[in-house]
Amino acid sequence: MGEGDAIWAPPILPHSTLGTLSHHPELHFGGKMESKVSEGGLNVTLTIRLLMHGKEVGSIIGKKGETVKKMREESGARINISEGNCPERIVTITGPTDAIFKAFAMIAYKFEEDIINSMSNSPATSKPPVTLRLVVPASQCGSLIGKGGSKIKEIRESTGAQVQVAGDMLPNSTERAVTISGTPDAIIQCVKQICVVMLESPPKGATIPYRPKPASTPVIFAGGQAYTIQGQYAIPHPDQLTKLHQLAMQQTPFPPLGQTNPAFPGEKLPLHSSEEAQNLMGQSSGLDASPPASTHELTIPNDLIGCIIGRQGTKINEIRQMSGAQIKIANATEGSSERQITITGTPANISLAQYLINARLTSEVTGMGAL
Protein backbone atom coordinates (compact mmCIF):
# COMPACT_ATOMS: atom_id res chain seq x y z
CA MET A 1 0.00 0.00 0.00
CA GLY A 2 1.14 3.53 -0.64
CA GLU A 3 0.89 6.50 1.69
CA GLY A 4 -2.63 6.99 2.93
CA ASP A 5 -4.06 3.98 1.09
CA ALA A 6 -7.54 2.97 2.15
CA ILE A 7 -9.02 -0.49 2.19
CA TRP A 8 -12.44 -0.01 0.63
CA ALA A 9 -15.57 -1.38 2.26
CA PRO A 10 -18.45 -1.08 -0.24
CA PRO A 11 -21.93 -0.07 0.77
CA ILE A 12 -24.58 -2.69 0.12
CA LEU A 13 -26.79 -2.11 -2.90
CA PRO A 14 -30.50 -2.85 -2.59
CA HIS A 15 -31.29 -6.21 -4.19
CA SER A 16 -32.94 -5.96 -7.57
CA THR A 17 -34.02 -8.28 -10.34
CA LEU A 18 -32.13 -8.87 -13.59
CA GLY A 19 -34.29 -6.43 -15.52
CA THR A 20 -33.43 -3.35 -13.45
CA LEU A 21 -29.70 -2.82 -13.97
CA SER A 22 -30.35 0.72 -15.24
CA HIS A 23 -31.46 1.68 -11.73
CA HIS A 24 -28.20 0.70 -10.07
CA PRO A 25 -25.73 3.37 -9.01
CA GLU A 26 -22.56 3.56 -11.05
CA LEU A 27 -20.68 0.60 -9.66
CA HIS A 28 -16.95 -0.02 -9.76
CA PHE A 29 -16.76 -3.50 -8.28
CA GLY A 30 -13.33 -3.77 -6.76
CA GLY A 31 -13.18 0.04 -6.71
CA LYS A 32 -15.25 2.96 -5.57
CA MET A 33 -18.89 3.69 -6.02
CA GLU A 34 -20.36 6.85 -7.46
CA SER A 35 -23.82 7.78 -8.64
CA LYS A 36 -24.43 9.69 -11.88
CA VAL A 37 -27.86 10.59 -13.11
CA SER A 38 -28.39 10.24 -16.84
CA GLU A 39 -31.47 10.23 -19.03
CA GLY A 40 -33.63 7.26 -18.19
CA GLY A 41 -32.06 6.63 -14.79
CA LEU A 42 -28.66 5.84 -13.34
CA ASN A 43 -25.78 4.90 -15.62
CA VAL A 44 -23.90 1.67 -14.85
CA THR A 45 -20.12 1.88 -14.98
CA LEU A 46 -17.92 -1.07 -14.10
CA THR A 47 -14.31 -1.67 -13.25
CA ILE A 48 -13.20 -5.20 -14.09
CA ARG A 49 -9.73 -6.56 -13.37
CA LEU A 50 -7.95 -9.21 -15.43
CA LEU A 51 -4.87 -11.22 -14.48
CA MET A 52 -2.42 -11.70 -17.37
CA HIS A 53 1.05 -13.11 -17.95
CA GLY A 54 3.76 -10.94 -19.48
CA LYS A 55 3.35 -12.37 -22.99
CA GLU A 56 -0.39 -11.68 -22.94
CA VAL A 57 0.22 -8.13 -21.72
CA GLY A 58 2.75 -7.60 -24.51
CA SER A 59 0.11 -8.66 -27.04
CA ILE A 60 -2.40 -6.19 -25.57
CA ILE A 61 0.08 -3.30 -25.52
CA GLY A 62 1.47 -3.90 -29.01
CA LYS A 63 4.36 -2.09 -30.70
CA LYS A 64 4.93 1.30 -29.07
CA GLY A 65 1.57 0.90 -27.30
CA GLU A 66 -0.38 1.07 -30.56
CA THR A 67 -2.69 -1.90 -29.83
CA VAL A 68 -3.83 -0.74 -26.39
CA LYS A 69 -4.26 2.81 -27.72
CA LYS A 70 -6.55 1.50 -30.46
CA MET A 71 -8.52 -0.57 -27.92
CA ARG A 72 -9.02 2.48 -25.71
CA GLU A 73 -10.13 4.68 -28.60
CA GLU A 74 -12.47 2.18 -30.27
CA SER A 75 -14.06 0.78 -27.10
CA GLY A 76 -14.29 4.01 -25.11
CA ALA A 77 -13.09 2.13 -22.00
CA ARG A 78 -10.17 3.10 -19.80
CA ILE A 79 -7.56 0.31 -19.90
CA ASN A 80 -4.74 0.46 -17.36
CA ILE A 81 -1.93 -2.07 -16.90
CA SER A 82 -0.04 -2.52 -13.61
CA GLU A 83 3.72 -1.97 -13.32
CA GLY A 84 5.96 -4.25 -15.32
CA ASN A 85 8.39 -5.83 -12.83
CA CYS A 86 6.07 -8.78 -12.12
CA PRO A 87 5.55 -12.04 -14.08
CA GLU A 88 1.81 -11.43 -13.70
CA ARG A 89 0.12 -8.09 -14.39
CA ILE A 90 -3.28 -6.67 -13.53
CA VAL A 91 -5.19 -5.15 -16.47
CA THR A 92 -7.96 -2.85 -15.24
CA ILE A 93 -10.83 -2.01 -17.60
CA THR A 94 -13.23 0.76 -16.59
CA GLY A 95 -16.20 2.29 -18.38
CA PRO A 96 -19.89 1.98 -19.21
CA THR A 97 -21.01 -1.60 -19.75
CA ASP A 98 -21.06 -1.23 -23.56
CA ALA A 99 -17.47 0.02 -23.55
CA ILE A 100 -16.40 -2.79 -21.21
CA PHE A 101 -17.87 -5.44 -23.52
CA LYS A 102 -16.24 -3.86 -26.61
CA ALA A 103 -12.87 -3.88 -24.84
CA PHE A 104 -13.34 -7.52 -23.83
CA ALA A 105 -14.26 -8.43 -27.41
CA MET A 106 -11.12 -6.75 -28.75
CA ILE A 107 -8.92 -8.51 -26.18
CA ALA A 108 -10.53 -11.92 -26.83
CA TYR A 109 -10.19 -11.58 -30.62
CA LYS A 110 -6.58 -10.40 -30.25
CA PHE A 111 -5.77 -13.51 -28.20
CA GLU A 112 -7.49 -15.69 -30.81
CA GLU A 113 -5.37 -14.04 -33.51
CA ASP A 114 -2.25 -14.82 -31.45
CA ILE A 115 -3.32 -18.49 -31.18
CA ILE A 116 -3.91 -18.73 -34.95
CA ASN A 117 -0.52 -17.13 -35.68
CA SER A 118 1.26 -19.50 -33.29
CA MET A 119 -0.42 -22.51 -34.95
CA SER A 120 1.03 -21.63 -38.35
CA ASN A 121 4.39 -22.89 -37.08
CA SER A 122 2.92 -25.81 -35.13
CA PRO A 123 1.84 -29.33 -36.16
CA ALA A 124 -1.25 -29.05 -33.92
CA THR A 125 -4.54 -29.38 -35.80
CA SER A 126 -7.08 -28.43 -33.12
CA LYS A 127 -7.22 -24.78 -32.10
CA PRO A 128 -6.99 -24.26 -28.31
CA PRO A 129 -9.61 -21.99 -26.70
CA VAL A 130 -9.05 -18.37 -25.77
CA THR A 131 -8.58 -18.04 -22.00
CA LEU A 132 -9.07 -14.97 -19.79
CA ARG A 133 -8.73 -14.72 -16.00
CA LEU A 134 -10.90 -12.29 -14.06
CA VAL A 135 -10.06 -11.18 -10.51
CA VAL A 136 -13.23 -11.17 -8.39
CA PRO A 137 -13.79 -10.44 -4.65
CA ALA A 138 -14.17 -13.76 -2.83
CA SER A 139 -17.40 -12.60 -1.18
CA GLN A 140 -19.05 -12.45 -4.62
CA CYS A 141 -17.93 -15.90 -5.75
CA GLY A 142 -20.70 -17.67 -3.85
CA SER A 143 -23.30 -15.82 -5.93
CA LEU A 144 -21.36 -16.60 -9.09
CA ILE A 145 -21.29 -20.31 -8.28
CA GLY A 146 -24.90 -20.45 -7.04
CA LYS A 147 -26.56 -22.99 -4.77
CA GLY A 148 -25.12 -26.39 -5.58
CA GLY A 149 -23.25 -24.86 -8.54
CA SER A 150 -26.53 -23.98 -10.28
CA LYS A 151 -25.55 -20.46 -11.41
CA ILE A 152 -22.17 -21.36 -12.86
CA LYS A 153 -23.74 -24.36 -14.63
CA GLU A 154 -26.37 -22.05 -16.14
CA ILE A 155 -23.66 -19.65 -17.38
CA ARG A 156 -21.67 -22.50 -18.92
CA GLU A 157 -24.68 -23.96 -20.71
CA SER A 158 -26.10 -20.67 -22.00
CA THR A 159 -22.78 -19.24 -23.27
CA GLY A 160 -20.81 -22.34 -24.27
CA ALA A 161 -17.81 -21.05 -22.31
CA GLN A 162 -15.96 -22.99 -19.63
CA VAL A 163 -15.95 -21.11 -16.30
CA GLN A 164 -13.91 -22.09 -13.27
CA VAL A 165 -13.78 -20.30 -9.91
CA ALA A 166 -10.53 -20.91 -8.01
CA GLY A 167 -10.99 -22.63 -4.66
CA ASP A 168 -8.29 -20.56 -2.95
CA MET A 169 -7.91 -16.82 -2.71
CA LEU A 170 -5.05 -15.13 -4.53
CA PRO A 171 -2.05 -14.51 -2.23
CA ASN A 172 -2.45 -11.80 0.42
CA SER A 173 -5.85 -10.71 -0.87
CA THR A 174 -9.55 -11.45 -0.51
CA GLU A 175 -9.97 -12.08 -4.24
CA ARG A 176 -10.19 -15.21 -6.39
CA ALA A 177 -9.33 -15.91 -10.01
CA VAL A 178 -12.25 -16.77 -12.31
CA THR A 179 -10.98 -18.47 -15.49
CA ILE A 180 -13.09 -18.26 -18.67
CA SER A 181 -12.23 -20.35 -21.76
CA GLY A 182 -13.92 -20.65 -25.14
CA THR A 183 -14.44 -18.81 -28.41
CA PRO A 184 -14.29 -15.00 -28.29
CA ASP A 185 -18.09 -14.80 -28.71
CA ALA A 186 -18.67 -17.29 -25.87
CA ILE A 187 -16.28 -15.36 -23.62
CA ILE A 188 -18.05 -12.05 -24.31
CA GLN A 189 -21.47 -13.56 -23.48
CA CYS A 190 -20.00 -15.14 -20.36
CA VAL A 191 -18.48 -11.84 -19.17
CA LYS A 192 -21.87 -10.13 -19.66
CA GLN A 193 -23.56 -12.71 -17.43
CA ILE A 194 -20.82 -12.48 -14.80
CA CYS A 195 -21.23 -8.68 -14.75
CA VAL A 196 -24.95 -9.10 -14.08
CA VAL A 197 -24.16 -11.36 -11.10
CA MET A 198 -21.57 -8.88 -9.81
CA LEU A 199 -24.09 -6.04 -10.00
CA GLU A 200 -26.79 -8.10 -8.30
CA SER A 201 -24.48 -9.28 -5.49
CA PRO A 202 -22.00 -6.54 -4.50
CA PRO A 203 -18.99 -7.41 -2.29
CA LYS A 204 -19.60 -7.95 1.43
CA GLY A 205 -17.23 -6.18 3.80
CA ALA A 206 -13.82 -4.88 2.76
CA THR A 207 -11.93 -6.13 -0.28
CA ILE A 208 -8.15 -6.50 -0.13
CA PRO A 209 -7.06 -6.41 -3.80
CA TYR A 210 -4.57 -8.86 -5.26
CA ARG A 211 -1.20 -7.38 -6.15
CA PRO A 212 1.13 -9.65 -8.16
CA LYS A 213 4.55 -10.17 -6.62
CA PRO A 214 7.79 -9.02 -8.32
CA ALA A 215 9.95 -11.60 -10.06
CA SER A 216 12.80 -11.26 -7.55
CA THR A 217 12.43 -10.20 -3.95
CA PRO A 218 14.83 -9.16 -1.17
CA VAL A 219 14.69 -10.94 2.18
CA ILE A 220 14.40 -9.58 5.71
CA PHE A 221 14.30 -11.20 9.14
CA ALA A 222 11.91 -10.23 11.89
CA GLY A 223 10.83 -12.18 14.94
CA GLY A 224 13.03 -15.12 13.91
CA GLN A 225 11.09 -15.57 10.66
CA ALA A 226 12.27 -15.07 7.07
CA TYR A 227 10.16 -12.70 4.97
CA THR A 228 10.34 -11.54 1.36
CA ILE A 229 9.37 -8.00 0.41
CA GLN A 230 6.67 -7.86 -2.25
CA GLY A 231 6.02 -4.24 -3.14
CA GLN A 232 4.82 -2.73 0.13
CA TYR A 233 4.27 -6.09 1.87
CA ALA A 234 6.38 -8.58 3.82
CA ILE A 235 5.40 -12.15 3.00
CA PRO A 236 6.63 -15.32 4.80
CA HIS A 237 9.40 -16.68 2.62
CA PRO A 238 9.09 -20.13 0.97
CA ASP A 239 10.90 -23.28 2.03
CA GLN A 240 14.15 -22.63 0.17
CA LEU A 241 15.18 -20.22 2.96
CA THR A 242 14.52 -22.73 5.75
CA LYS A 243 18.27 -23.29 6.17
CA LEU A 244 18.92 -19.56 6.48
CA HIS A 245 16.06 -19.26 8.95
CA GLN A 246 17.56 -22.06 11.08
CA LEU A 247 20.98 -20.40 11.03
CA ALA A 248 19.47 -17.15 12.22
CA MET A 249 17.50 -18.87 14.98
CA GLN A 250 20.70 -20.53 16.23
CA GLN A 251 22.41 -17.15 16.46
CA THR A 252 19.63 -15.24 18.18
CA PRO A 253 17.05 -17.40 19.95
CA PHE A 254 13.72 -15.66 20.39
CA PRO A 255 11.31 -16.36 23.26
CA PRO A 256 7.72 -17.44 22.62
CA LEU A 257 5.29 -14.61 21.97
CA GLY A 258 4.31 -12.90 25.19
CA GLN A 259 7.61 -13.44 27.06
CA THR A 260 9.81 -10.41 27.59
CA ASN A 261 13.35 -10.26 26.31
CA PRO A 262 15.35 -7.04 25.88
CA ALA A 263 16.80 -8.46 22.65
CA PHE A 264 13.34 -8.78 21.07
CA PRO A 265 12.19 -5.62 19.37
CA GLY A 266 11.30 -7.56 16.24
CA GLU A 267 14.34 -6.16 14.46
CA LYS A 268 16.34 -7.95 11.76
CA LEU A 269 18.61 -10.70 13.06
CA PRO A 270 22.36 -9.98 12.86
CA LEU A 271 23.55 -12.17 9.99
CA HIS A 272 27.04 -10.68 9.65
CA SER A 273 28.53 -13.33 11.95
CA SER A 274 27.50 -16.15 9.61
CA GLU A 275 29.44 -16.36 6.35
CA GLU A 276 27.18 -19.19 5.19
CA ALA A 277 24.10 -17.04 5.75
CA GLN A 278 25.67 -14.25 3.69
CA ASN A 279 26.38 -16.63 0.84
CA LEU A 280 22.81 -17.90 0.89
CA MET A 281 21.55 -14.36 0.76
CA GLY A 282 23.80 -13.52 -2.19
CA GLN A 283 25.14 -10.37 -0.53
CA SER A 284 27.90 -9.74 1.96
CA SER A 285 26.98 -6.53 3.71
CA GLY A 286 24.23 -4.12 4.58
CA LEU A 287 21.82 -6.52 6.26
CA ASP A 288 22.75 -5.42 9.76
CA ALA A 289 22.62 -1.70 8.96
CA SER A 290 19.70 0.00 10.66
CA PRO A 291 17.89 2.27 8.20
CA PRO A 292 16.33 5.45 9.58
CA ALA A 293 12.80 5.22 10.94
CA SER A 294 9.97 6.28 8.67
CA THR A 295 6.20 6.58 9.02
CA HIS A 296 3.39 5.01 7.00
CA GLU A 297 -0.32 5.74 7.32
CA LEU A 298 -3.32 3.68 6.27
CA THR A 299 -7.04 3.81 6.94
CA ILE A 300 -9.26 0.94 8.04
CA PRO A 301 -13.09 0.88 8.06
CA ASN A 302 -14.54 1.27 11.56
CA ASP A 303 -16.32 -2.07 11.34
CA LEU A 304 -12.99 -3.88 10.86
CA ILE A 305 -10.83 -2.04 13.40
CA GLY A 306 -11.90 -4.41 16.19
CA CYS A 307 -10.20 -7.38 14.54
CA ILE A 308 -6.94 -5.39 14.41
CA ILE A 309 -7.11 -4.30 18.08
CA GLY A 310 -8.39 -7.57 19.57
CA ARG A 311 -9.84 -8.08 23.04
CA GLN A 312 -8.15 -5.64 25.44
CA GLY A 313 -5.60 -4.80 22.74
CA THR A 314 -4.14 -8.32 22.50
CA LYS A 315 -3.97 -8.46 18.69
CA ILE A 316 -2.43 -5.03 18.14
CA ASN A 317 0.13 -5.76 20.86
CA GLU A 318 1.05 -9.03 19.12
CA ILE A 319 1.49 -7.15 15.83
CA ARG A 320 3.68 -4.53 17.57
CA GLN A 321 5.83 -7.22 19.18
CA MET A 322 6.20 -9.35 16.05
CA SER A 323 6.94 -6.45 13.70
CA GLY A 324 8.99 -4.23 15.99
CA ALA A 325 7.05 -1.21 14.69
CA GLN A 326 5.30 1.47 16.70
CA ILE A 327 1.62 1.37 15.78
CA LYS A 328 -0.87 4.05 16.79
CA ILE A 329 -4.60 3.86 16.09
CA ALA A 330 -6.36 7.24 16.02
CA ASN A 331 -9.53 7.73 18.02
CA ALA A 332 -12.82 7.53 16.18
CA THR A 333 -13.81 10.83 14.57
CA GLU A 334 -17.44 11.90 14.55
CA GLY A 335 -18.92 11.54 11.07
CA SER A 336 -16.05 9.40 9.77
CA SER A 337 -16.46 5.74 8.85
CA GLU A 338 -12.70 5.07 9.02
CA ARG A 339 -9.86 5.03 11.54
CA GLN A 340 -6.30 6.06 10.76
CA ILE A 341 -3.39 3.77 11.67
CA THR A 342 0.13 5.22 11.86
CA ILE A 343 3.05 2.77 11.64
CA THR A 344 6.56 3.98 12.55
CA GLY A 345 9.81 2.03 12.21
CA THR A 346 12.34 0.80 9.69
CA PRO A 347 11.03 -0.13 6.24
CA ALA A 348 11.31 -3.80 7.27
CA ASN A 349 9.31 -3.19 10.47
CA ILE A 350 6.63 -1.28 8.57
CA SER A 351 6.33 -3.93 5.83
CA LEU A 352 5.97 -6.70 8.39
CA ALA A 353 3.37 -4.73 10.37
CA GLN A 354 1.40 -4.16 7.15
CA TYR A 355 1.54 -7.86 6.33
CA LEU A 356 0.28 -8.83 9.80
CA ILE A 357 -2.53 -6.25 9.66
CA ASN A 358 -3.57 -7.49 6.22
CA ALA A 359 -3.52 -11.08 7.49
CA ARG A 360 -5.95 -10.12 10.27
CA LEU A 361 -8.21 -8.31 7.79
CA THR A 362 -8.13 -11.25 5.38
CA SER A 363 -9.17 -13.63 8.14
CA GLU A 364 -12.00 -11.34 9.24
CA VAL A 365 -13.29 -10.56 5.74
CA THR A 366 -13.19 -14.20 4.70
CA GLY A 367 -15.36 -15.02 7.68
CA MET A 368 -17.89 -12.42 6.48
CA GLY A 369 -18.16 -13.74 2.93
CA ALA A 370 -21.12 -15.97 2.18
CA LEU A 371 -19.14 -18.41 0.03
From Swiss-Prot:
KH domain location: 45-95, 129-182, 293-357
This protein's UniProt keywords: Cytoplasm, DNA-binding, Repeat, Ribonucleoprotein, RNA-binding
GO MF annotations in UniProt: C-rich single-stranded DNA binding; RNA binding
One GO term describing the cellular component: cytoplasm
InterPro entries on file: KH_dom (IPR004087), KH_dom_type_1 (IPR004088), KH_dom_type_1_sf (IPR036612)
Tissue expression as described in the entry: Widely expressed, with highest levels in testis and fat tissues and lowest in heart.
Gene3D superfamilies per UniProt: K Homology domain, type 1
Major localization class: cytoplasm
Pfam families linked to this entry: KH_1
Cellular compartments annotated: Cytoplasm
GO biological process, one term: negative regulation of transcription by RNA polymerase II
General function of this protein: Single-stranded nucleic acid binding protein that binds preferentially to oligo dC.
Protein name: Poly(rC)-binding protein 3
Chain's gene name: Pcbp3
